[in-house]
């Protein structure tokens, strides 16, 4: 039971060297006793790593269960342990080599074979080129003489000396990374190549025969490879590699072969398609250049053929005169290219619109561009010629062009414009520009706009400019932005006739039972504009129009308020009658009395309002030369008051009139039912 526990190596989670694990040795097998050297940990690791999995399944399953055998253990994935458990064989770094080297057949660790009387060591060769050269030169010189002596010495070595040589040679270190089994089969080719490269003489055939004989004798005497045989094979392989290198270097200098397999087609970045597209573009460009050159040559030939009739002297004089002009043009081009702005800031200052959409509202800038003073016409021909000569003598640099700066549409400029709009100070230039920038339709519109501008000057606000697509015309006036749309707030200053028409339509719709005639209101301007000698046109449209509007508004407000009052009182009476059906005949009569009184009052007041314009018509017909005196408006009709009552006291509204709120209010067509107008 204890033997079974000892034979299975324990697993630990240690990933580094830990104490006594270095001295671990496997127990001897059941077949026979083995020396301590054969049970060494490092030797067993190298031996098991060199074997294939199918050769010794027991050893590989015992040693490589957690390390490299991917076929036997499902936890491993690429030759290294994935679960973190290490066997005692994988303690130090000296026992492990890179997994890439174990994939090759020729790079295998050495094997120490145990026999009854002696140990025959199959040594290895390092891949270090310096050691290969030293050993190759040494062994090649003393190959024939010292071969038997080395065999006897190696046989007479003890197990301790063998163990020391194993520890020095077989364990991989930083200098000795990997090992190589050499084969004697390539011996003949190596010697033949080396003899041909050294001396190109017929004596090399003798050397070939001697080497063949010695190699055959060595192979026949020793079935297993001895130390000298392995050294010979390594020597032959090293010489073979050197001869190959020299032959390739001498025959032809070839580039290193790439691992990629490519066809013999055109090797270019992106394949044949990109190659031919680039080729087509180049050919097209060259064809265009050739065509331009041919056209220039042909047109020049035509021009020169026209001037063949001239003499050579004139032609030479023309060519001489052309030379300084061409030079001057080249200088100007160079100067312009050097002065041209490069950075965005320079382009912006020099007038290049780069990444900024600059729109000019030309209609708003027209009064600024046009000079206010009218130039006087000079009829003297002599003065005109002198002025032309003076302007021609002035160089181009001194002439200054008056250009208006472009308006940049940036958030900061829009904010600045909005802050200017809030200020109440108006400059006389702005008012003059605004006055000039108004659109002229006809004489009547001009008079209205001039009166409007005079009223706006006192307030100090900017006037709405002429219509343009740019934002500048809207940003100069008070406006508001709603969902990325600029809505101007100065629309109330302009007369909108639709409002008056809507009010008339609403008033006509509301008069279902009662009809009020509005023809006298339309006849009022005719009476004012009857005599031509009475007042000019400006007085007619400037002064009396406002009075007529106020009179018309006053009339409508009184009519609408009385209608609303009457309807509310009738609704309250009907509501109380429906809620109290058990009323007596006296109570119903008492309710009908105030309604009848309201109707009579309304008729009398309506007749007074209609008679107002009838009296004016009679007076205007009888006295046309006298001034029309408008009746003064009553103060209590200009503003109205209403009383707000709670909806719970609607039934007892006739008895108690306790007002919750009492405020003066202007006319409104949408009054709620709970309000009582007084």
Swiss-Prot record:
Acidic residues: bias regions: 613-628
- UniProt-annotated stretches for the region Disordered: 1-35, 138-167, 190-210, 242-261, 602-632
Q: Which cellular component, as a GO term, is one annotated location?
A: cellular bud neck split septin rings
Q: Bias category Low complexity: which stretches?
A: 245-261
**Which regions are flagged for Polar residues bias?**
9-19
Q: Give GO terms for biological process.
A: maintenance of protein location; positive regulation of mitotic actomyosin contractile ring contraction; protein localization to cell division site after cytokinesis; regulation of protein localization to cell division site; secondary cell septum biogenesis
Localization, per the record, is:
Bud neck
Family membership noted in the UniProt record = Belongs to the AIM44 family.
Identification of the protein by name: Altered inheritance of mitochondria protein 44
What is the originating organism of this protein? Answer: Candida glabrata (strain ATCC 2001 / BCRC 20586 / JCM 3761 / NBRC 0622 / NRRL Y-65 / CBS 138) (Yeast)
Recorded name of the encoding gene: AIM44
